[in-house]
Amino acid sequence: MSRILIRNVDAITLDEQNRVLKNTNIAIDGKTIVALGDVPRDFAERADEIIDGRDHVALPGFFNAHVHAPMSLQRGWAEDLPFDRWLNERIWVAESALTEEDIYWGAALAACEMIRSGIVAFADHYFWMDQVARVVEESGMKALLAWCIFGLGADKEVGRASLERTEEFVERWQNAGDGRVKTTLGPHSPYICSPQFLTRALNDAVKLGVGIHLHVAESQAQVARSLKEHGKTPVAHLASLGVFDVPTIAAHCLYVSDDDIAILADKRVTAPHCPKTYLKLAMGIGRVPAMLARGVNVALGTDGPASNNTIDILESARLTTLLQKNEQRDPEILPSMQMLKLATQNGAWALGFADSGVLRVGARADVILFDFAKPHLRPRHDLAANIVHSAHATDVDHVIVDGRVLLRKGKLTTLDEERILREAERRAFRLVGQEMRPIREYQH
């Protein structure tokens, strides 16, 4: 295991006191932060790598709590459409032509983008997840992986998948990659999956000792349909089935009542917020302040590149706080330090990496460095505000995961970026250039 010393760096710790340390040192031994501030005199002599932190700001790495990483192949393919047509005319059609190899290269392209933007871990929800797990192993990132399943029969599933097949994936990959790969079950949503199928998925999750990741309450139409079919909101419906009795990531939760929010809080459900997708598809902006006030674990996600077009948690943080400040007519809500916690430790807890998301002795060494020697990041009155409101993803120039450097001075160390760019684009053009067919239909 290697030893890394980051010298003379400013650090946003995101600890309980929200300490910001100036001109400090961070010592990493193996996977763990072993010193913050004063470092043992002989550590520098024994260090395998010394990083000059002058003009840099360190903070915990970002966690993407909801993404469809291989959809990077569909970036720019489904533009300027409402949600139903976006799914029915573009996304679910293109997915009928996907291959396992497409998934690998799409996930690899996404991994390049995520590492470059300071994302150290992601919760992925897509198909052929063995291929995504391969990318996680090779890249050095962390992930919570869910194989998406609809429960509509093999002819309506990508790759003719089944719940049994997704269970086998869980058993193969849980805690692989030296603990960096975690798994969960991925029934798509209560508006696609029947109550019987959701109950089967829940029982299997309990048997396997894992959680569930699904989409919840993305539109008013979904809520109305749930009330008509089940007599309950989507959140209440899932709670009545017992789905929230296992660790649950309920992506979006845009249309939730006060009673729904109470359920989410009481069941410790994570609600990832993906604002750029909501804006692009004109879906709404959600009730983030109300959920946080009630104690819901709101984390940040990006959703897939087909609806967001980028995989940038910093952008999600910025849009979330700006939209909610404007919606609530309250400039004091969701301050920068809180947004950084949503982007880091809230996601870390949701993905099962609770020992990350903070800079302190004993925490996992998941650290990113922003290069602050830039005009748009000076002066440094408020480092957290500079990052949330001024920084770009391209300002990240070091990424460390479990004590391993994945990005050094802006260069990827674990992935062949040139080859990935070439192969991913070739496969993306092939994907949309062949015969495709709708394999299921989204109905309001």
Q: Where are the model-predicted features located?
A:
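Active-site microenvironment of metallo-dependent hydrolases
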Residues: M1-T24, I28-D29, K341-H444
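Divalent metal-coordination and catalytic microenvironments
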Residues: V9, I26, K31, D55, ...
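Active-site gating loops and adjacent loop-to-helix segments of metal-dependent hydrolytic enzymes
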Residues: L73-W105, C112, S139-A161, Q220-P247, ...
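Alpha-helical scaffold segments that flank or form the walls of functional sites
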Residues: R75-M141, L163-A176, E425-M436
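Active-site glycine- and acidic-residue-rich loops that bind
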Residues: A123-Y126, T184-R200, L279-L281, A350-G352
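Metal-coordinating catalytic core of metallo-dependent amide/deamination hydrolases
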Residues: Q131-L254
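His/Asp/Glu-enriched, well-ordered alpha-helical/loop segment
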Residues: S240-P247, P289-K374, S390-A391
